[in-house]
């Protein structure tokens, strides 16, 4: 049993491969490069191909399947970069990673606090030795209503951690759960939109919820609403977000993800023209905090993501059920 790791980061992920290889009895090979037509052959002799979010085409899957690859363990919670229908046709099985929810949850709360207290502007002005107070007054989160869309592991952790701040909490999910009810009131989306000062997204990306935050949704929100997204970039229509920021309907945004980020994030683009017009525009707003999909990035989470690949392949190869497998 052998896994080919593509886009394996030598400065963090690689250190965890050897111990988990021994623990699960699975060999591995790796490259720091993302999959391309020129390096697909690296997967010859492997039973699994593991990737981070990057460009994966149906043709890549066909080539790997012809080499005998059966498993596609993603080293990320999201798996929307994998052509799922093609994988199903080829009989290839997909899994995603798991890691403790606190890292992303606390990062989302950090973005809320930074936006409320205008930390981005304060730091930029401090870099220019502007230590005046004018324009830096923040808002107190304890007097605000926060809406959490998606109450899975991360969304519930956001609610639990926010409950100590004293703010009012509302939640929306297609499948409400009792743990979240300890901290928040479940409401419909329209009620959440019109009631909340801060809205934070914690739901998976699906075809059904693509651009769920569009012009119509934004029009229903409170004036000056703060939007936080540490989930998936496709949840927000970037054009509607830009229009909302320009009009002042959206008071601020904290974004760790954006649409069409694959191939852009996790690479050094210093000196390059940014190949994402919406992101280039969003970065120009002083009331937007942008980070390049790093909410997950802790030592605990990186170890968990690498282990998830080994653990899922071991279970699927042995015919065991695993919650990490994606049901196609």
What positions do the PLM features span?
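N-terminal glycine-/charge-rich "phosphate-binding" loop or analogous flexible N-terminal tail
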Residues: 1-46
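Short acidic/histidine-rich motifs immediately flanking catalytic phosphotransfer sites
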Residues: 42-48, 67-70, 194-199, 222-225
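Phosphate/diphosphate ligand-binding glycine-rich loop within oxidoreductases
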Residues: 46-123, 135-138
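Short glycine-/small-residue-rich Rossmann-like dinucleotide-binding loops
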Residues: 53-54, 197, 203-205, 231-232, ...
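Rossmann-fold NAD(P) dinucleotide-binding segment
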Residues: 56-69, 208-227
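A short helix->loop->beta-strand "cap" motif at the edges of active sites that frequently abuts
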Residues: 66-71, 90-92, 167, 223-225, ...
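Rossmann-like dinucleotide/phosphate-binding beta-alpha-beta segment
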Residues: 136-223
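Rossmann-like dinucleotide-binding domain for NAD(H)/NADP(H)
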Residues: 224, 233-328
């Amino acid at each position: 049993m052998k896994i080919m790791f593509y886009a394996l980061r030598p400065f963090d992920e690689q250190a965890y491969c050897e111990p988990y290889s021994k623990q699960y009895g699975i060999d591995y090979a790796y490259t720091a490069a993302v999959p391309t037509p020129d390096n697909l052959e690296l997967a010859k002799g492997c039973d699994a191909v593991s990737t981070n979010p990057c460009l994966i085409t149906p043709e890549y899957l066909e080539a790997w399947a012809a080499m005998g690859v059966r498993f596609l363990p993603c080293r990320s919670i999201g798996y929307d970069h994998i052509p799922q229908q093609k994988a199903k046709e080829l009989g290839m099985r997909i899994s995603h990673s798991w890691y403790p929810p606190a890292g992303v949850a606390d990062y989302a709360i950090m973005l809320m606090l930074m936006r409320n207290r205008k930390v981005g502007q304060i730091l930029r002005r401090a870099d220019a030795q502007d230590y005046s107070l004018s324009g830096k007054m923040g808002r107190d989160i304890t007097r605000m209503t926060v809406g959490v869309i998606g109450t899975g592991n991360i969304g519930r952790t956001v609610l639990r951690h926010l409950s100590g701040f004293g703010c009012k909490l509302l939640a929306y999910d297609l499948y409400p759960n009792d743990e979240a009810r300890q901290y928040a009131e479940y409401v419909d989306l329209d009620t959440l939109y019109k009631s909340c000062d801060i809205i934070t997204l914690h739901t998976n990306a699906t075809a059904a919820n693509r651009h769920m935050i569009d012009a119509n949704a934004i029009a229903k929100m409170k004036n000056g609403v703060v939007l936080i997204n540490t989930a998936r970039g496709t949840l927000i229509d970037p054009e509607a977000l830009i229009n909302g920021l320009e009009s002042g309907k959206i008071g601020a945004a904290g974004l760790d993800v954006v649409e069409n980020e694959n191939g852009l994030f996790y690479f050094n683009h210093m000196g390059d023209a940014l190949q994402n017009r919406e992101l280039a525009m969003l970065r120009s707003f002083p009331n937007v905090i942008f980070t390049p999909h790093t909410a997950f990035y802790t030592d605990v989470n990186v170890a968990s993501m690498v282990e998830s690949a080994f653990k899922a392949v071991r279970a699927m190869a042995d015919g065991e059920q695993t919650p990490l497998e994606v049901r196609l």
